[in-house]
């Protein structure tokens, strides 16, 4: 299963962990997000396997991403999405859409999307009727964020202590390079900070590109 843009995160399980006790969110790829005033969010996904696959989708709300996240069912049609399930032939493409019908205020909202892929093999044995053969289902997860009505990107940086705090009302991504050389091709250290979260890391206090 190949998922374009934010669905690339589904090539493997989403890696989410916290660095010591800093309560900063680390993930292996981008978080999907939309502005609260947008009518819907849409991304294509492609079945790049050699089998016909059944894809099923589910979404629920969480307090915030992380190991101790608390999930709750979607209330009052706040989130609508389509399709609920879809069978794709090898190489076939479909669009997954999310419609946000909740409040447009200064609160950032977080959701977890679960996409399950089940190979479905149709065979015809010795002239008998075609029988569907199911294989184990693989479920993959990613996060979806609805930003506040008026996103406020603010932070507090205490360089001598190596502390970075998100003082705004929406998450942002941070990239730390090992040095300030513009030609440095080394992989940057990437993490995300949610509102009111902070991280303490020696790399922040070092002379580097941020």
Each language-model region and where it sits:
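Sec/Tat signal peptide C-region and signal peptidase I cleavage site
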Residues: 18-24
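Intrinsically disordered, low-complexity Pro/Gly/Ser/Thr-rich segments with frequent PxxP/GP/PP motifs
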Residues: 70-103, 183-208
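Beta-sheet-dominated interaction scaffolds and their linkers
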Residues: 24-49, 85, 150-157, 190
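Bacterial N-terminal signal peptides
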Residues: 8-18
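Positively charged n-region of N-terminal signal peptides that target proteins for export
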Residues: 1-8
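Asparagine-centered strand-capping/turn motif at beta-strand->loop junctions
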Residues: 43-49, 162-170
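Terminal connector regions
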Residues: 101-151, 207-210
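Short acidic, flexible loop segments centered on an aromatic residue
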Residues: 50-74, 116, 169-185
């Amino acid at each position: 299963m190949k998922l374009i843009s934010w669905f690339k995160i589904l090539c493997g399980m989403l890696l989410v962990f916290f660095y010591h006790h800093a309560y900063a969110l680390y993930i292996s790829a981008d978080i999907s997000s939309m502005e609260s005033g947008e009518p819907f969010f849409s991304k294509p996904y492609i079945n790049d396997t050699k089998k016909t696959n059944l894809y099923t989708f589910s979404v629920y709300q969480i307090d915030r991403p992380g190991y101790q996240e608390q999930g709750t069912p979607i209330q009052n049609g706040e989130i609508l999405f389509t399709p609920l399930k879809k069978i794709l032939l090898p190489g076939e493409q479909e669009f997954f859409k999310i419609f946000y019908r909740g409040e447009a205020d200064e609160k950032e909202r977080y959701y977890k999307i679960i996409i399950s892929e089940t190979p479905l093999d149709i065979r015809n044995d010795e002239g008998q009727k075609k029988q569907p053969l199911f294989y184990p289902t693989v479920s993959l997860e990613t996060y979806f964020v609805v930003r506040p009505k008026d996103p406020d990107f603010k932070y507090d940086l205490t360089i001598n202590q190596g502390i970075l705090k998100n003082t705004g009302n929406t998450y942002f991504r941070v990239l730390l390079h090992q040095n300030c050389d513009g030609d440095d091709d080394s992989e940057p250290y990437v993490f995300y900070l949610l509102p009111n979260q902070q991280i303490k890391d020696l790399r922040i206090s070092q002379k580097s590109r941020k």
